[in-house]
UniProtKB/Swiss-Prot annotation:
The lineage of its organism: Bacteria, Pseudomonadati, Chlorobiota, Chlorobiia, Chlorobiales. GO terms for cellular component: cytosol. It comes from the Bacteria. InterPro entries: AlgH-like. This is UPF0301 protein Plut_0637.
Length: 189
């Protein structure tokens, strides 16, 4: 699929996948869930960059969440964001795709988690986000930095972080299957 067609497919609710050519450390071999994509810019969260500490250790009010906090991206890395499956329970949630929601009332979220109504496996917390201004992401597509793919809530909440990039690239089929199996630094082979 050509670069133009890849970019045309990009929308909120799609996956943004770093191409094998994208070596910039913030995004090398990342898979992002896109939550906004419009003429003003784009916003998403890196799905496969868990941090070395748990949500309960880093986010006040979420003492029962023994799940990793994730690096969502390099923008505003002092802010906490969350994706979850329960828009029916959390006021102010924005549906990204059926069964996947972004944000909502944090106090309500904390109560639901701490009382066991909401399971930690139904939510993913991110520190910061990935953001692009108008035209910036389109230019990166033209440079060959990104691919797109369809998303499901199961992909967002999968715990297989290390293999997420290769599995997602492979799922595109065709020439992408070869790319998915390529080593990170082919020149060192």
């Amino acid at each position: 699929m050509g670069v133009f067609n890849e970019y045309k497919r990009l929308a909120a609710g799609k996956l943004l996948i770093a191409s094998a050519n994208l070596l910039e450390s913030n995004f090398k071999r990342t898979v992002l869930m896109m939550c906004e994509h419009n003429p003003q810019g784009s916003l998403g969260f890196i799905l496969n960059r868990p941090m070395e500490f748990q949500v309960r250790e880093a986010v006040a009010g979420f003492d029962e969440v023994d799940e990793p906090l994730h690096m969502g991206g390099p923008v505003q890395s002092n802010t906490v964001h969350f994706l979850h499956m329960r828009g029916d329970l959390i006021d102010g949630s924005e549906q990204i795709l059926p069964g996947l929601y972004w944000g909502g009332d944090r106090e309500e979220l904390g109560y639901l988690l701490n009382t066991g109504v909401l399971k930690p496996s139904e939510i993913r917390f991110f520190l910061g986000y990935a953001g692009w201004s108008a035209g910036q992401l389109e230019a990166e597509f033209e440079e060959g930095s990104w691919y797109t793919a369809d998303a499901t809530p199961a992909m967002v909440f999968s715990g297989e972080y290390e293999r997420m990039w290769s599995r997602t690239v492979r799922s595109k089929g065709g020439e992408y299957q070869l790319i998915a199996n390529s080593p990170e630094l082919p020149g060192l082979n």
